[in-house]
């Protein structure tokens, strides 16, 4: 079983916490992580691109000249694609880029990035993040006590609203509830700060 140091908010060590190897001791699978990140980034795309085809262009309902007898090429509409200001052929239309990967694949990807954080010594366990009021200054002090000064993902338990509010406007800090953890945010962070209760909720959901 893997164990990491458990810290208090003031930065002093409060013993060790044992991690479940079924969640934090998995051999990282880069291919699965790549697929999961690709899926998440695809679902983030707006997909609102659009062009006007000949039916969406204004005008063009009348045949510009008669079919025969003029010596000119036959035309049916001034909004045909070959005309200036005509419609676009096979242009992009609004669509969703999102797709789903199997649940087992997503779970393995999440376990892989969590396990990689442990291997990189980038996981910081805190016994709790308790604040009297949701003050950003107090949250920054805790991060300084933990020697965390890089891009950080903080995982808190579901009912810790004050911690979620205290750090939400820090530029290099993202705070998520334990149930909202995802592959992209974990992989994109340099440090992963997790409370004791959030660890328990993670292991309960993924083990």
UniProtKB/Swiss-Prot annotation:
InterPro entries: Ribosomal_uL4, Ribosomal_uL4-like, Ribosomal_uL4_dom_sf. Pfam families: Ribosomal_L4 (PF00573). Residues 45-78 are annotated as: Disordered. GO terms for molecular function: rRNA binding; structural constituent of ribosome. Keywords: Ribonucleoprotein, Ribosomal protein, RNA-binding, rRNA-binding. GO terms for cellular component: ribonucleoprotein complex; ribosome. GO terms for biological process: translation. This is Large ribosomal subunit protein uL4.
């Amino acid at each position: 079983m893997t164990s990491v140091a458990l810290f208090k908010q003031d930065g002093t060590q409060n013993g060790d916490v044992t991690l479940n190897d079924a969640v934090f001791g998995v051999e990282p699978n880069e291919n699965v992580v790549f697929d999961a990140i690709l899926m998440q980034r695809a679902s983030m795309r707006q997909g609102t691109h659009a062009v006007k085809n000949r039916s969406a262009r204004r005008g063009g309902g009348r045949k510009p000249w008669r079919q025969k007898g003029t010596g000119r090429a036959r035309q049916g509409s001034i909004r045909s694609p070959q005309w200036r200001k005509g419609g676009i052929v096979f242009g992009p239309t609004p669509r969703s880029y999102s797709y789903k990967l199997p649940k087992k694949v997503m779970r393995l990807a999440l376990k892989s990035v969590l396990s990689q954080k442990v291997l990189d010594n980038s996981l910081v366990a805190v016994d709790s993040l308790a604040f009297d009021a949701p003050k950003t200054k107090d949250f920054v002090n805790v991060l300084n006590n933990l020697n965390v000064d890089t891009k950080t993902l903080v995982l808190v338990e579901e009912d810790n609203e004050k911690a979620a509010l205290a750090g939400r406007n820090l530029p290099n800090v993202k705070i998520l509830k334990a149930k909202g953890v995802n592959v992209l945010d974990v992989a994109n962070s340099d440090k992963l700060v997790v409370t004791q209760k959030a660890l328990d909720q993670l292991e309960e959901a993924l083990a």
